[in-house]
């Protein structure tokens, strides 16, 4: 919103899982939602450079430069079936959406590996959610990412095809709903190469994670990213880690880049 990429109206209308709009949540927190909107400070930005820990194992040097942010989408898979008793319903008589979901999760894993992409079912909702009940509905959220838009679209199509075929076999239903799809962000090559030159040939690599830099790039601001090595390759976990020397190297790199850009 501050960058002008998302309108205040759309942002304030967004709801949480309980249906509470952002505007109401802000009011409940004592914040006036009418103050939400583009920031004049963003319009004053000539260039944005973000320093961030690398969130995988792709960087072997202390500091690297980003080439792009992979496109990624989040899709809601709704599997419908027939609720029934877990103890009395014969296995061959079931219309179990959990089984369809489970096979879809395996298909997503396989298809992502074949495409050199990423596919993750990280959130699940089950109805009636009883230990002794065959579910009537399973809702699962897929996070899919790839190096380019075509690969992402083909990945989703392959997963959906296998899920649909499995649903037909299981006597269940499937509905796939895109919830958000972010396009690829290619950082300006001239700016990227300038950073590489300042940093004496630092390695260049893409990232599969979303970043603030992507938003500023979408806002039309020349944007670049610096990464600090992550020896564990782990992110979104307490095990995420970077050596102090690498962190200091990252700070030095950012300072050198900003000094060069200020010339």
Describe the role of every protein-language-model region:
Residues 136, 202-256:
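Zn-dependent metallopeptidase/amidohydrolase metal-coordination segment
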Residues 154-164:
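Short amphipathic alpha-helices in soluble, non-transmembrane regions
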Residues 3, 23, 27, 76-77, ...:
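Predominant activation on well-ordered alpha-helical scaffold segments within soluble catalytic domains
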Residues 120-130, 141-148, 173-192, 214:
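A short beta-alpha structural unit
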Residues 62-64, 79, 157, 190-194:
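A generic structural signal for tightly packed, nonpolar segments enriched in small/aliphatic residues
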Residues 93-96, 187-190, 242-246:
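Alpha-helix N-cap and loop-to-helix initiation/capping positions
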Residues 111-119, 167-173, 199-202:
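Short secondary-structure junctions
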Residues 1-150:
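Midchain, well-structured core segments that form catalytic/ion-binding scaffolds
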């Amino acid at each position: 919103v501050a960058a002008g990429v998302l309108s205040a109206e759309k942002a304030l209308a967004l709801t949480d899982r309980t249906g509470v709009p952002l505007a109401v949540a802000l009011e409940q927190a004592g914040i006036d939602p009418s103050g939400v909107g583009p920031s004049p400070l963003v319009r004053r930005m000539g260039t944005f450079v973000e320093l961030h820990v690398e969130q995988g194992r792709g960087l072997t040097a202390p500091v690297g430069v980003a080439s792009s942010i992979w496109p990624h989408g989040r899709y809601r898979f709704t599997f419908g079936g027939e609720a029934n008793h877990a103890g009395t319903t014969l296995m061959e008589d079931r219309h179990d959406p959990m089984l369809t979901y489970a096979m879809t999760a395996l298909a997503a894993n396989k298809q992502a590996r074949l495409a050199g992409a990423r596919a993750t079912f990280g959130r699940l909702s089950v109805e009636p959610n009883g230990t002794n009940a065959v579910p009537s509905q399973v809702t699962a959220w897929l996070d899919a990412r790839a190096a380019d838009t075509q690969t992402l679209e083909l990945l989703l199509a392959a997963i959906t095809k296998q899920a649909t075929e499995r649903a037909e076999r299981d006597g269940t239903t499937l509905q796939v709903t895109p919830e958000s799809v972010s396009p690829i962000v290619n950082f300006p090559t001239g700016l990227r190469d300038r950073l590489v030159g300042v940093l004496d040939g630092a390695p260049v690599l893409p990232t599969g994670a979303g970043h603030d830099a992507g938003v500023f790039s979408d806002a039309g601001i020349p944007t670049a990213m610096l990464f600090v090595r992550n020896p564990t390759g782990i992110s979104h976990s307490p095990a995420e880690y970077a050596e102090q020397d690498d962190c200091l190297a990252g700070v030095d790199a950012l300072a050198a880049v900003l000094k060069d850009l200020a010339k």
